[in-house]
Amino acid sequence: MRDVIGAPAGWIARAIRTKKISSLEVVRAHLEHIHTVNPRLNAVVFATAESAIKEARAADRHNTRKGALGPLHGVPFTVKDIFNTAGLPTTAGVRIMRSRIPDHDATVVARMRRAGAILIGKTNCPPVHGENSWSPVHGGTRNPYDINRSPGNSSSGEAAIIAAGGSPLGLGSDSGGSIRLPAHYCGVVALKPTAGLIPVTGGYGLTGGMTDPRSQVGPMARYASDLAIALRVLAGPDGIDSGVVPVPLPKRVPKLAGLRVAWYADDGMAKPTPAITATVKAAAKALGSAGCVVTEERPPWLGEAYQLTMGFWGRKHMSRDRMDQRWDAFRSSVLKFMSRFDLVLSPVAPDVAPLFKTKFVSDHQFSYTMPYSLSGNPCVVVRAGTSPENLPIGVQIVAAGWHDDVAIRAAHAIERKLGGWRPASVVR
């Protein structure tokens, strides 16, 4: 069963559906792997071994008698501990919520279950989308590539356990980089979807609706192809989150050949390391070899995005009316830029994973991710390189709104050309 550890979720689903392996075997293998690696990582804070084994047996019986329930039938998954899970604690890393047990699932958890997936654990996160991987409830999570480093914030445990092979697929949340930074630091793939594509209902601290387009829920995995599967499971209105728009996903993804790509390695605020710069250039070259028309061009509105971010976070005084005016103008500028390009390629952060419990020395740590939280554009992070310290380096691929699938397709091309996810040192 070691073969399934590190395998794509799509491959696992096909193997279960065709009865080459059983869901019980797969779930047991991942639970055993979590038992092996989690003491060093502290990524999974609630394991659901008993219920997961029971559900896996039921999944195998159903597969034998009636076939698969959905595209993820029998596949294990994990979720960040901000999502409601019926009968299981949901603490969000907040002390006063240590004994909180919801009686219903978050929309995205329910949709994963309906697709046949089996929950095997909930993962650590800092409170209120905090700035490092430390939780006052569960302690800190370590990076599987170097346990002296952080996996990032705030989908910390999710990125760490996926990178370490303990889960093939998971759910995180992102308000300014909380999916994308951990994906970069841990060398996995992740999607921050178009604002309004996936409901945030049942996610602690995610208000949803048009008043909070920055906060999104998205899938995390090791392979870009698994993001595509999860996107189709998760997208669409739930009748509760008023910000979700009933826009159908396209049936076909356009080919990369001929797509226009703008790339930049330096946003002018947070200077990247040479390794980050080299990785972005390599990713741009990979897209060029896939037939994209690649141009080095930095968007002119990155500085304005930083100022707006400071207003949102209270670092800079700005009235609500003035904020709304500048935000509208900013989004118009992004739309104008994206009318010239199909994709934008950039760093995720200026450096690799910071040391454990290190506080970010500057808000510029988010300067590469926050612009696209404010604009609502979909972003995919994929590993495209390795630092001199042997740490993962990801790149950020931004697409036009509602074209999440195009960003995923580009990530797949980079993954194939540059290697993508690699086994973490903690499990070698």
What is each of the regions a protein language model found here?
Residues 1-54, 289-291, 423-428:
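An N-terminal boundary/leader segment
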Residues 19, 30, 74, 114, ...:
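Glycine-rich, small-residue loops and helix-cap segments
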Residues 23-28, 57-60, 274-298, 320-341, ...:
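Acyltransferase
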Residues 30, 52, 227, 261, ...:
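Residue-level signal for inorganic ion chemistry
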Residues 62, 68-91, 118-121, 287:
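Conserved small-residue hinge/capping positions at short loops/turns
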Residues 86-99, 164:
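DPxDG-like acidic metal-binding loop motif
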Residues 104-234, 373, 378-394:
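Short glycine/serine-rich loop segments
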Residues 192-278, 418-428:
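A short helix-breaking turn/cap at a secondary-structure junction
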